[in-house]
Regions:
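A short glycine-centered flexible hinge/capping loop motif at secondary-structure junctions
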Residues: 179-183, 390-394, 431
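Bacterial Sec-pathway N-terminal export signals of envelope proteins
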Residues: 19-69, 75, 225, 230-267, ...
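Periplasmic alpha-helical coiled-coil/stalk elements that build and connect Gram-negative outer-membrane
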Residues: 51, 139-250, 365
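Short terminal targeting/anchoring segments
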Residues: 187, 392-416
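Sec-dependent N-terminal signal peptides
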Residues: 4-13
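Small/polar, glycine/serine/threonine/aspartate-rich low-complexity segments that form flexible
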Residues: 67-104, 282-318
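Acidic, low-complexity, intrinsically disordered peripheral segments
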Residues: 7, 18, 413-440
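Sec/SRP-type N-terminal targeting helices
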Residues: 40-44, 57-58, 110-137, 187, ...
Length: 440
């Protein structure tokens, strides 16, 4: 009965696989770069940086404003002037209760080093946003590649388990026939059934694990969750090896740290620029009206008269003392510069160590993969010979099951070695700046 159910499940899965879209690694990477939601936030930050540049550039352009106002001086102010011309020491004049004004105002910086440096800082921040996006894209490529390799590995594992189940089912049928003819013990049949049940559990676990891996892959590349996908069968004989050209010191991670150091230096310059004077051009075009009764503005007469006042000039601002605020900013910026230098030096040394270890890992995993492949093929041959001898009544059931277990271990070791080989090569592709090979 179990065999019938297993056969039915394989048939259903075979029909289900026909509806799957088979995606190559390059297709998954392209989809991820175009659709990944987290990466889109980095794209948004790049766009935001462009707007920041425009915002800072606007501070160097003329600023034109229109203003208007109406005041009710219910206690009118007075002005006091010399009254000797009128035969008294002071002349006191009370202003009218209502006054209104309309003006056009112009202000444009002629020299402002802080505004120029702020614009330069915004360009550096834009560069940081771009580098952060590129680094996030590289991290996404590595993440998708590992998921893809893992799904391939699980698919291979499922295929091997299915083959092992088929072999054990044949062995069970033979053992059952031997038992029916008093040529084998009932315990031998039970032993095969136990191993067969263990393989069925492994198969179910591997299928569940594969489903979860595909779900995660679909999430990362923003593929419709209700549609099925499948990975291509790996070509274990051909791995696109990374060229061992040494650590690429223009990796986006290192460029980010260098740019952060540049940003800290420019922030220090911005604090120093605060000591410099600023010069601005100013101008105004103003009309003002006064009256003792607001209704007079709606009738012609002497009280309904607007007085024009125009002017142009320059304003100079020279910082003298700010309570040592700028000095503290300069010292803080210097600490940021020193920390940025240390971070870059530490990252560079760390990545050089990573590269050296990755080269060793690749060579070691390459050897392990070759050995485990040979060991896996050898274990299959041994199992086949022992199985044939068992059919002939020469070998015992214990020998068959022991060789079957050894073959299963060799198969798992082979799959693990292949996955480790791919991951170590992926690490080197990243450290040498060759990840673009995977997209092609």
């Amino acid at each position: 009965m179990k065999r019938i159910l297993f056969t039915i499940s394989l048939t259903v899965l075979a029909g289900y696989s026909l509806a799957q879209e088979k995606l190559s690694l390059g297709q998954c990477l392209q989809m991820g770069i175009e659709r990944n939601l987290n990466l889109k936030t980095y794209e948004g930050n790049v766009l935001k940086g462009k707007h920041d540049i425009s915002e800072n550039r606007s501070r160097l352009l003329p600023q034109i404003n229109i203003g208007a106002g109406l005041n009710d001086n219910f206690t009118p102010p007075v002005s006091v002037t010399d009254g000797t011309a009128y035969g008294k020491p002071y002349n006191v004049t009370k202003t009218l209760q209502y006054n209104s004004s309309a003006s056009l105002q112009l202000q444009m910086p002629l020299y402002s080093q802080t505004a120029l440096t702020a614009l330069d800082i915004s360009k550096t921040l834009d560069r940081l946003n771009t580098l952060s996006y590129e680094k996030a894209k590289e991290d996404l490529i590595v993440q998708i590649s590992k998921m893809y390799y893992l799904a391939q590995n699980t698919e291979e594992q499922i295929g091997i388990i299915k083959d092992n189940i088929k072999r054990l089912e044949e062995l069970r049928d033979i053992t059952q026939a031997f038992h029916d003819n008093d040529m084998a013990l009932s315990v031998d049949v039970k032993r095969v059934n136990v191993n067969l049940e263990n393989l069925s559990v492994q198969y179910d676990n591997a299928k569940a694990m594969l489903t979860q891996q595909y779900n995660m892959l679909k999430y990362v590349i923003d593929y419709p969750a209700d549609q099925a996908i499948a990975v291509e069968k790996p070509n274990v004989e051909q791995v696109d090896l990374a060229a061992l050209t040494g650590l690429n010191e223009n990796l986006y991670e290192l460029q980010l740290l260098r740019t952060q150091q540049t940003l800290a230096e420019k922030k220090k310059k911005l604090a120093k620029d605060g000591y410099l004077p600023t010069l601005a051009l100013t101008g105004n075009w103003t009309y003002t009206a006064f009256t003792d009764n607001i209704k007079n503005w709606f009738h012609s007469g002497e009280s309904n008269h607007w007085y024009k006042s125009n002017g142009i000039g320059v304003s100079l601002r020279i910082p003298v003392f700010d309570g040592f605020e700028k000095r503290s900013k300069i010292r803080k910026a210097q600490v940021d510069i020193d920390n940025a230098k240390l971070s870059y030096e530490n990252a560079l040394k760390g990545m050089r160590t990573q590269y050296a270890n990755a080269v060793d890992d690749l060579a070691n995993n390459q050897r392990n993969f070759s050995r485990q492949r040979d060991n896996y093929l050898l274990a299959e041959d041994i199992y086949k010979v022992t199985s044939d001898r068992y059919r002939e009544g020469i070998a015992s059931m214990t020998e068959v099951l022991q060789d079957e277990m050894s073959m299963s271990d060799a198969q798992n070791n082979y799959l693990t070695a292949h996955f480790n080989y791919q991951v170590s090569n992926l690490t080197l592709l990243k450290l040498t700046g060759q990840l673009d090979k995977l997209i092609k």
